[in-house]
Amino acid sequence: MMENVFDYEDIQLIPAKCIVNSRSECDTTVTLGKHKFKLPVVPANMQTIIDERIATYLAENNYFYIMHRFQPEKRISFIRDMQSRGLIASISVGVKEDEYEFVQQLAAEQLTPEYITIDIAHGHSNAVINMIQHIKKHLPESFVIAGNVGTPEAVRELENAGADATKVGIGPGKVCITKIKTGFGTGGWQLAALRWCAKAASKPIIADGGIRTHGDVAKSIRFGATMVMIGSLFAGHEESPGETIERDGKLYKEYFGSASEFQKGEKKNVEGKKMFVEHKGSLEDTLIEMEQDLQSSISYAGGTKLDAIRTVDYVVVKNSIFNGDKVY
């Protein structure tokens, strides 16, 4: 059993002496594999978060993205399309039999996506290990992200199998009900799980799920994440896929989990739910605000780059921030 678990709202980072005159001097860029990105943040590879249009926008503006895998037949044309424009191609695959054929087809057509994310709910499995090895054999140049996991053993096994990065988080997301349906996961202690996994990792970790505020991005970096995957904060923008509805004069957009019946079209092994999130305006505005908030975080950390956040002190305060303040 693990003692002293904590989650995002239980932690406050402690400021160090500021060395910049303006937060605009702080650099939020991060390198993952061979590419450098503007923010250590990636929108979740979910159907109500990303589509081709958003992927293109993100890639053109130097943000990392991962395309979802729920229209598998479109992936080849997507890779071609992105690469023909000089943009990176970053796709997701599952672990079923036809995904093995898909990887071989890419190799046969000499299509090498820059990033491939193997993305299943319980990533500590032979199925994922075999797929990592398969991709590394046929597409050795692709950067492989594997997940999702929640333990140091899993991180080490996937790294040893050849994963270039691992994705940590089992069920902490807002539209994920894994914790309720199964009793398992990192919901409620995602930040402690991230820290535990990061200590075992020798390659980058992507924290996935449970982010509710921009400050949580800084906290993720502090506890070892290279990149932070975010769903709900990216849901509900003008550009977001998904239907807009009006209720009592307010606009909302649908947001659903990848293992929900809305996603699957059937009620089998459902571990996701649907919710409506308030319409948030433009994606660009949110990305700019995230960058500015992270620049402020770096200045509070007493540095000019993201790495400064990794060494700050912190305190564990149960639910400090929420003493009556509604932040979302």
UniProtKB/Swiss-Prot annotation:
Residues that coordinate or bind NADP(+): 205-228
Active site (catalytic residues): C176
Keywords: NADP, Oxidoreductase
EC number in record: 1.7.1.7
Any Gene Ontology biological process: purine nucleotide metabolic process
Recorded superkingdom: Bacteria
Matches recorded under PROSITE patterns: IMP_DH_GMP_RED
Positions of transmembrane segments: none
InterPro entries registered for this protein in UniProt: Aldolase_TIM, Dihydroorotate_DH_CS, GMP_reductase, GuaC_type_2, IMP_DH/GMP_Rdtase_CS, IMP_DH_GMPRt
Pfam family membership, one: IMPDH
GO molecular function: GMP reductase activity; oxidoreductase activity, acting on the CH-CH group of donors
Catalytic activity line of the entry: IMP + NH4(+) + NADP(+) = GMP + NADPH + 2 H(+)
HAMAP family registered for this protein in UniProt: GMP_reduct_type2
Function comment: Catalyzes the irreversible NADPH-dependent deamination of GMP to IMP. It functions in the conversion of nucleobase, nucleoside and nucleotide derivatives of G to A nucleotides, and in maintaining the intracellular balance of A and G nucleotides.
Family from the record: Belongs to the IMPDH/GMPR family. GuaC type 2 subfamily.
Name of this protein: GMP reductase
Organism: Bacillus cereus (strain ATCC 14579 / DSM 31 / CCUG 7414 / JCM 2152 / NBRC 15305 / NCIMB 9373 / NCTC 2599 / NRRL B-3711)
Gene encoding the protein: guaC
